[in-house]
């Protein structure tokens, strides 16, 4: 899953695109490198990012989705939003196929009803707190168990509402310390009990560059290591900034598994 941020302030500068020419160039690059789906986001979730009104988020998404339809109409497209009205617009008007909700329905209580009505796949992500508060003092007794239970409860609720095409995302970096992130990664296999596909988003995040020292721009090597570990531990989808490196990691893991 290649990341397309139609924002001016996402945490990794290399993923920011605002103008149609930039969006088109980014999409062509990801498609050529082997992206199998595109995730379009118009609201930066990094702590301290400027708030964006629903109207502005929709305007950005309309612009981005229009270019996606032009460049790669054959690829599935997810829309990265926690707002139900934005999700509805993106699917019904913009042609998005999947809703990717970083808040797991917690920041807009209409989200579950909306995706059930849209009958589209839904990416359910765990986050403790909100983007503004999530890194102030995250606390868990057992992060792997608590994240698994949290996801399981919401998957059950979604099933009861008629939403059955669900992908689970443990939410690396969202309301978790460095130690929490690596404990969660170490126990990633625990999420197999959810019996849904697993998405992992660790690309160029602080769990890479804070551990190694450096910045998001210097975090590709560490990201590739985490992608490899995630695939070996059962991840089905990688949400990535650097498609070529992720595709190569996937090919190597698949070759190892084929010959094991």
Across the structure, where does each feature detected by a protein language model lie?
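N-terminal glycine-rich anion-binding loops that anchor highly charged ligand groups
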Residues: 1-2, 29-42
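Short polar catalytic/cofactor-binding loops
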Residues: 5-9
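Active-site-adjacent loop and "lid" segments of alpha/beta metabolic enzymes
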Residues: 11-29, 45-63, 67-70, 76-78, ...
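Conserved Motif II region of HX4D acyltransferases
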Residues: 171
């Amino acid at each position: 899953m290649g990341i397309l941020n139609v924002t001016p302030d996402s945490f990794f500068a290399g993923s920011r695109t605002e103008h149609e020419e930039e969006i088109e160039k980014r999409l062509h690059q990801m498609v050529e490198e082997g992206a199998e789906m595109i995730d379009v986001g118009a609201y930066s979730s990094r702590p301290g990012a400027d708030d964006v009104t629903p109207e502005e988020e929709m305007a950005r998404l309309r612009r981005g989705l229009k270019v996606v339809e032009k460049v790669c109409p054959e690829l599935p497209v997810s829309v990265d939003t926690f707002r139900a009205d934005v999700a509805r617009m993106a699917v019904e008007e913009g042609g998005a196929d999947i809703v990717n909700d970083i808040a797991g329905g917690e920041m807009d209580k209409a989200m579950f009803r909306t995706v059930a009505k849209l009958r589209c796949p839904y990416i359910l992500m765990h986050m403790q707190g909100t983007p503004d508060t999530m890194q102030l003092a995250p606390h868990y007794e057992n992060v792997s168990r608590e994240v698994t239970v949290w996801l399981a409860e919401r998957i059950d609720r979604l099933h009861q509402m008629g939403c059955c095409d669900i992908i689970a995302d443990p939410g690396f970096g969202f309301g978790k310390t460095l130690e929490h992130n690596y404990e969660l990664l170490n126990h990633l296999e625990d999420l197999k009990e959810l019996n849904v596909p697993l998405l992992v988003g660790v690309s160029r995040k602080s769990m890479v560059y804070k551990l190694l020292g450096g910045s998001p721009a210097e975090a590709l090597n560490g990201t590739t290591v985490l992608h490899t570990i995630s695939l070996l531990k059962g991840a089905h989808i990688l949400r990535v900034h650097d498609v070529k490196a992720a595709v190569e990691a996937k090919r190597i893991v698949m070759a190892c598994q084929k010959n094991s």
